[in-house]
Every structure is written in C-alpha cells, then in structure tokens.
Amino acid sequence: MSLPFSQDERDLAAGGILTIDLAALRHNYSAIATRIAPTRTAAVVKADAYGLGASRVAPAFYEAGCRDFFVAHLGEAVALKPFLKPDATLYVLNGLQPGTEAACAREGILPVLNSLEQVENWAALATRLGKKLPALLQFDTGMSRLGLSAKEFDRLLENVTLLSRIDIKFAISHLANGDEPGNAANARQLAKMTALLARLPKLPAALANSGGTFLGKTYYFDLARPGIALYGIDPERQHDFSDKVAHENKKPKHSILPVLTLSARVIQVRDVDKGATVGYGGTYVANGPMRIATIAVGYADGLFRSLSNKGAAFFGDTRLPIIGRVSMDSITLDVTSLPEGTLKLGSLVELIGPHQRLEDVARDCDTIPYEILTALGNRYARVYVYVNGGGTSTTA
C-alpha cells in the first residue's frame, strides 16, 4: 500500500513558494478603516481574494473588523460563505444571471442590481416570496461598465411598486479613475453620484474603491470598498513606469504593507560557452562563458512571457537577469555573478519580495499588479504566515 502524498512532499515538489502574510493583510484593512472612519470599510475578495485564497484571506479581514465582503460572481459568494461568521454580509458585484435569484435569496447573499432587468427579476422573486428582499443598486456615473443608466433610473423612480419590493441597502457606483488623484473625471462622477442620491433621500451610498479612499472625505459616503490596496499595492504607484531607481526610491504615501513574497526553486545549473543560445527561438546568445540556472516556474505560473530577456530574480542582494524566453514551466537566469556552487538543485531565488516588489514585476511586464497577482495560479506551495503580527506560520 502506497503512502499518501503528504503536504510537506507537495510543498517540496512545487516549483515555487508563495508566502502570504495575513498580519499584513489585517494591517492594511485596519489602516484604511481607521483613516476613513466612521465610514464602513468593506473588503473586495473577488477572484479568490485576488488570487491569494479567499478562504484564508477573508477571515483575516474579518478578524480586523470587516463585516462586508464583495465578490464578482454568486458562485464565489456561496463558496466563501462557510468560511465567514453569520454576521458577515456577502455582496455580488456582477448581479445575478436569470434563474439564480432564488439561490441568492436562499443563501442570504445580497446582489448588486446593475440593470432594470435585474431589478425587475429580483422584485418578481420578492413578490413570489411575499417579502421585501435586500439588495444594492448600482448607477453608472461615468465608467460605462455596470449600473443603471440615467434613463433606467428615471423609469425606476416612476415605478413605485417595483421599488417597494426591494430593500435597497446602498446605492453604489464605481470610480473609473480613482487611482489618479488629479483626474477631473473623479469630480464629475462624484457630482453625478450626489445628484442621483438627492433623488433617493437618506439612502446610504458607496463610491470609493482603493484609490477613492485617498481622494478625500467627500468620496467616502457610508461604505468604501477597497480592493488592491488591501493586498499591498499603493493605488497611486501601480501605474508608475519610471526607471527602476526612481521607482524604488519613491516612498509610498500611505501605510500599506506588502503582503506576499514569491520564490522559485532551481532545477538546474550549468556552464555554457560563448555563442550558446538560450531558450525557444535562441533569442539570447551568450557573449562569453557564463553560468546559467533554470528555475521551475514560467508563464503558467503568472510570470508572463513579456519578462523574456527583461525581468530578473534575486539571490540575496544579487540581481539575476532573466535570459531567453520565458517558457510555460521554466525560466533561465544569468547567475554568472554568483560564486560557483552558490546555487544548486532545490535552491530558492526571490521573484517578489524585499528586493523586487509586485509593482516592479508588473512594470517589467508592461502591465498592472492586478494582472500579475490574479495570474499566480495554484501550482505554488502556499504558506500563510503572521510576519508583521508575530506568531507562527501555517501552511495551506
């Protein structure tokens, strides 16, 4: 009889280790919640908490005082519900597909109603059940993505019976440029939101996303729903594509802590001669004798092909450039600068951490941190720790 594949063996077999600091997540939530109080602070945990594991991340936010959690799809909410206590409320940002209304009501999950059709479907269920059903109502104030249009809002206000069937908890909208403090579009959206709320007196409202929580009190309203800031990304830095030195020397304006580190295992170290080509297509040619190392992660693990001949890993303080094309399951590094024997089979190199933040990797990929974070995938060994808060680490 064969022995089961143990968790330790799974971790050792993985191509890399993704370490997630739950204490830093709690700190980031508390820092935002304290600063914008008495406005309530929700947590956006869609896409499996931005790829970090909603079943572990959401309870950490709950421990920090969060009671409002936003996901994108009803299935995400149903999956997360068992990991939260009964006084937590789950909201579905994309609203409901036809035929899912009864399941949503049965589970006690609140939909964000984004169109007149969704409002009508939710109200119809309320009529069948003989009771008002709670929901959030979203308005489009300038993003042209989700939410009732001005014409739909006019039609809704004319239908008193329809409105009477729904217990609207919040009127919400979403800022398209909240991470750009100087963008005039923010003020235009705020003005539209204020005008809409004037027609719905005393209704609580929510507008601010991560960036919006740094725009000033007029954007806070009654509930804010930060996302990326909770996961360690300063919303004002994420689009900084300046040179690396300037980027690293720019101190964050806000007390947001990084929440993850990512390391990868070495699977081979070898010496190559001048003229040797590296990787698919031979896009890198050795300009002299050099030592190279292959690590066991690739674009299937969120390290995009755009890092080819461009990005880097670190071993201690030593930068190890990526050479050749990034493959699906492997990346090759120039490790000539390290003494011979420093790296060997199983050694770990840093991909995201104190020497290279998530924003730096995103910049090298010509993308945003959201895309890297949500693409990291499930092939890493995941370790959840309480670094900033002390205590012991636990392995997922």
Curated annotation (Swiss-Prot):
Substrate binds at residues 145, 328. Catalyzes the interconversion of L-alanine and D-alanine. May also act on other amino acids. Gene3D superfamilies: Alanine racemase, Lyase, Ornithine Decarboxylase, Chain A, domain 1. This is Alanine racemase. One of its GO terms (molecular function) is alanine racemase activity. It comes from Brucella canis (strain ATCC 23365 / NCTC 10854 / RM-666). Belongs to the alanine racemase family. The keyword Isomerase applies. It catalyses: L-alanine = D-alanine. Pathway: Amino-acid biosynthesis; D-alanine biosynthesis; D-alanine from L-alanine: step 1/1. Its cofactor is pyridoxal 5'-phosphate. The active site is at 46 (proton acceptor), 280 (proton acceptor). The lineage of its organism: Bacteria, Pseudomonadati, Pseudomonadota, Alphaproteobacteria, Hyphomicrobiales. Keywords: Isomerase, Pyridoxal phosphate. InterPro entries: Ala_racemase, Ala_racemase/Decarboxylase_C, Ala_racemase_C, Ala_racemase_N, Ala_racemase_pyridoxalP-BS, PLP-binding_barrel. The modification N6-(pyridoxal phosphate)lysine is found at residue 46. It holds the Pfam family Ala_racemase_C. Transmembrane segments: none annotated. It is an enzyme of class 5 (isomerase).
